[in-house]
Amino acid sequence: XSGDS
């Protein structure tokens, strides 16, 4: 996943 915030 990704961890964009």
Curated annotation (Swiss-Prot):
Question: Additional info?
Answer: On the 2D-gel the determined pI of this unknown protein is: 4.5, its MW is: 28 kDa.
Protein name (record): Unknown protein from 2D-PAGE from elementary body
- The organism named in the record is Chlamydia trachomatis serovar L2 (strain ATCC VR-902B / DSM 19102 / 434/Bu)
